[in-house]
């Protein structure tokens, strides 16, 4: 199975953000994003348990090497990977069949091991929240979908 997985660092893109955001009512392709709302963003910021996490060059390299290590250990193939300052995109091929597909396993493994390695490096404290809850896990069911996701990950990212 091929998946397009995205996950964000903690506190860097809250509901209400001027860029728009996704929630349960605004999470389908083609639907409007959650509208910017300064009051909602301020409220979400007040609920934060730790400061926002930004990935500098050293942290980005740590996350990238860790995701590649996890994929190798699991027997997965990474087809595209981009670690940015506030989120991670990865197109990964697992050994799952459609009947037992669980993209959340890949998402959770990537986040857990990246967190562990960042903490081991001394880059983040043990108390810091590192990633936002969950993330995006999209099934890629055709070669065209895989190619499109890889193109997006590798060629369509701004810092």
What are these regions (language model features)?
Residues 1-159:
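Short catalytic/metal-binding and nucleic-acid-binding patches
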């Amino acid at each position: 199975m091929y998946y397009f997985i995205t996950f964000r660092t903690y506190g860097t893109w809250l509901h209400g953000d001027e860029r728009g955001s996704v929630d349960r009512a605004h999470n389908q392709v083609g639907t409007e994003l959650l509208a910017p709302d300064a009051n909602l963003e301020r409220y979400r910021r007040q609920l934060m348990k730790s400061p926002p996490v930004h990935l500098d060059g050293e942290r980005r390299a740590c996350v990238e090497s860790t995701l590649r290590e996890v994929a190798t250990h699991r027997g997965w193939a990474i087809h595209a990977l981009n670690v940015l300052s506030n989120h991670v995109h990865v197109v990964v091929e697992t050994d799952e069949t459609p009947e037992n597909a669980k993209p959340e396993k890949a998402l959770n493994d990537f986040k857990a091991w990246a967190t562990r390695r960042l903490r081991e490096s001394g880059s983040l404290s043990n108390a810091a929240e590192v990633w936002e809850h969950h993330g995006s896990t999209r099934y890629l069911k055709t070669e065209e979908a895989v190619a499109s996701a890889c193109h997006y990950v590798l060629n369509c990212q701004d810092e």
